[in-house]
Amino acid sequence: HEIGMDFEIDFANAISEKTPNLCHLAPAGHTYIEDLNEAGGVYAVMNELNKKGLLHTDCMTVTGKTVGENIAGCENKNPEVIRPIDNPYTQTGGLAVLKGNLAPDGSVVKRSAVVPEMMVHEGPARVFDCEEDAIHAVLTHEIQPGDAVIIRYEGPKGSGMPEMFLSLI
């Protein structure tokens, strides 16, 4: 909205579908943002993605240089933190758009934080309008094993896609 450009949620899904997941940072993984920085940082991740032609390296950036100029020479110093492009954690990115009766216009899930056995789930849905209400329900034992916890009004149009892990404790 800030730049006056329409952005369809399906476009984000299409990008994630063709972008491999190269990092598995906490809380979903065993490495931390500090480890990513020591391994070469975001530019090293971008350099890996560029090996498969996934970036428009001729685009100008706020640095006054192109993407390609910015990532030139940024090597992956730790393949345990930043997986090589030919050995990703998953072939698809960390986000996915879900659609259905609970979210007919779509909702965003952090696919990389979902354990494989939960990729398909049937059960009651507990719907909350904010994370605080969901946390309250967890702390007062209103959430039962097998309940799907849905937190509405968070994300790109809400509070900017904060981590929702507090409601899972």
State the predicted function of each range.
Residues 1-169:
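Catalytic or ion-coupling anion/metal-binding cores of large enzyme and transporter domains
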